[in-house]
Amino acid sequence: MKTRKYKYLFLVAALGLTLTSCDDLFEPAKENNLGIDYMDKDASYAEGVLGNAYTRIPCGSFPFSEVGTDDAVSNDATNNWRKLAGGTWTSNNNPTERWRDCRAGIMYVNLFLSRVDGVHWADDDVARRLYACREKGEAFGMRAMFMYYLLQAHAGYDESGQLLGVPVVTTPEGASSNFNVPRNTFEECMKAFYADCDSALALLPDKYVDITSDASIPAYYKKMGADVDRMNRVFGVKFNGRMDASIVKAFRSKAALFAASPAFSAASGTNYQQAADYAAQVLDAIGGISGMDPNGWTWYANGSEIDALSNGANPKEVMWRGEKSQNNDWETDNYPPSLYGKGRINPTQNFVDAFPTANGYPVTDPRSGYDARNPYANRDPRLTAYVVVDGGQVGVNNTKINTEVGSGKDGINTEVGSSTRTGYYLRKLLRQDINLDPKVNSKQYHYTPRIRYTEIFLNYAEAANEAFGPKGTGTHSYSAYDVIKAIRHRAGITDDSYLDECAQSKDKMRELIRNERRIELSFEGFRFWDLRRWKAPLTAEAKGMNITADKDGNKVYTPVDVEDRDYKDYMYYGPIPYSELLKFTELKQNKGW
């Protein structure tokens, strides 16, 4: 096993990086038979070591983990999240596992950090030191990111009641290393995370930009002898897409909110005020609420914006993203079958019910005006932007989709493996200017955002409500109320009556914030983890909507049970991989697994 892990350190050839404009960011590493000492002589070889850490970024694509929650089911019987939600989740059958890749990523980072100062980055000594600083900053940021994802998937209480994280490893590991080490406490892991963030922030620019004057050079680098040309050579716009200070701050916001949440707060050493402050640092850099993208809620559908993205550039809504590529993969998987799709991800009635009516009231509130006989009328505009409901239009020809019982291949449960199981199809993430007809089979550009500013706004709202109350601001200029108001207004909900009512109670505002998060970040891999950190119920049955006609031809809407959720209480925390426990006796498993 030690030999296998040691080999990770030397697989530095030919990188297939999942980065924006990856070909411009890294040169392929030299053949690995040169030996690791070659790092000192060849900068591209050294870059290959760090590049191998980049290839292990867990947020490179959407996992559609919503299928494991109350928000969606899949019509694919082999879907791992569907099987997990049905009771097959074990420590050796774990779709949520991040141990292997994130631990390997940290190993690459540690090796890189141990050699970075000796690498011949440039002939010019000032440029060489600048390169070393930037590369170290990236590596520290990457190690912090990997720690966050490891804690999200594997932290938990052991049988003795201690909240544990993962082993904190900050030095290179080799054939003679002792891999049989215990897990650190969760709080120790968070301290290591924050330390890496601080180290990264001391070295990285907020954004990679080309500067024009010495006034823009940080004092630390000016003392090294940096000038405008050297700064642009090392920290210029061509490095967009790599780890920068704004990304590090965003992960600090994510991790702090995670640690302050009910599932971890008792032994994390992090509180909601810290989480609010860290989120605000990110948001203040874009002007706070005034920097919110008015079209951010439909980032995936802004076709002209996506098509025009150049290498390394980001839309206003997106802080960090994956590479832009031309394909029709999401549409092939999720368009309704009448449009040559597989209809894989089916939003649930539970999710549809989360959308308020146009006046902002929940559908369960009599003041909402919700009509169960016409359930999709007068609703939050985000509903039909994110979900294909009965009668919705999809694709280049605005084809009407009928999900009624017996209405054709798009009808509920008509064709096993291609028709919807809930009466709904996914619309969010999909471009509507794609034609899957085999005679056409058109493709369009897509990308996966790794961090959206909307997430950070929602992080702030959640933490600020808990720390300061609905309208409290702490040391900042905006409140949880202000953020949620802006998010709802940009989606078209401009009646603030219900929002104002929620602002009278921290509990009511918490409920509203969580619901807005559920809607805004839907199908982007959040809810599975949010439910767990909140210690919210996990076993709500996934429901659908059967639509039939009465004798007069009027539609009759009948909610139906679709799929059970079989989770045990210990499943608020994910397991340590069973294979690791077999090899290392010092590792303790989380309780219940």
Placement of each model-derived feature along the sequence:
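Sec-dependent bacterial lipoprotein signal peptides
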Residues: 1-20
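Membrane-proximal, proline-rich intrinsically disordered regions
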Residues: 22-68, 103, 119, 356-377, ...
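Conserved, well-structured interaction surfaces
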Residues: 42-48, 55, 79-156, 174-210, ...
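Short, surface-exposed recognition loops and adjoining beta-strand edges that mediate ligand/DNA contacts
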Residues: 63-76, 155-170, 206-247, 261-345, ...
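Long, intrinsically disordered, low-complexity segments
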Residues: 102-105, 177, 186-187, 192-194, ...
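Extended amphipathic alpha-helical segments enriched in small hydrophobics
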Residues: 143-144, 252-254, 445-494
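Flexible, polar/acidic helix-loop-strand segments at domain edges
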Residues: 370-453
